A protein has these predicted regions:
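Hydrophobic faces of stable alpha-helices that mediate helix-helix packing
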Residues: 7-10, 33, 37
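Membrane-proximal amphipathic alpha-helices
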Residues: 22-33, 49
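C-terminal juxtamembrane segment of a hydrophobic transmembrane alpha-helix
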Residues: 3-22
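Low-complexity, acidic interaction segments enriched in glycine
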Residues: 38-147
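Short amphipathic alpha-helical interaction patches enriched in hydrophobic/aromatic residues
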Residues: 16-24, 40, 44-47
């Protein structure tokens, strides 16, 4: 009987741990999404050009400047997939945002910051778009191009 109770307790603890880990990964995805959004904003506003990058690597070293101009320190892995397999959100062939490629259902469904209000009630992490500006209208079929 004691062994059965211990087994049930361990099962509950494992479930709670898995949920806590997913919540941590969601927070990390939000942080990384904001980093990319901020980098896209910096690239867009740099030198008054109003352009977006052609590649994510251009956020690491902006080719429009003779010396190193960095808008992003490094290319992050997607914390949900564990890989740098971001789907790019494109307009006119230029990167205006990123999104995860994960089809998993997010735990977080509401109570987002104002800049992330569009993430509410999305059925998949892949539906969480991190664009600059945050409320940029995008054409869905353009969001399927991968890096």
């Amino acid at each position: 009987m004691l062994v059965a109770f211990m087994g049930v307790g361990l099962t509950i603890a494992a479930g709670l741990y898995a949920t806590a880990m997913r919540r941590d990964k969601e927070r990390e995805l939000l942080f990384i999404g904001h980093e990319f959004r901020h980098a896209l904003e910096g690239y867009n506003k740099a030198n008054g050009a109003g352009q977006y990058p052609l590649t994510l690597e251009e956020l690491l070293k902006d080719p429009r400047f003779p010396s190193a101009k960095r808008h992003l320190r490094r290319l992050y892995n997607d914390p949900i997939t564990g890989k740098a397999d971001w789907a790019l959100v494109l307009q006119q062939g230029r990167i205006v945002g990123i999104r995860s490629t994960s089809a998993q259902r997010p735990i977080k469904q509401d109570n987002f910051d104002d800049d992330d209000a569009g993430l509410a009630k999305k059925p998949r992490y892949a539906d969480w778009l991190f664009t600059y500006p945050h409320d940029l209208f995008t054409v869905p079929q353009n969001a399927d191009v991968k890096r």
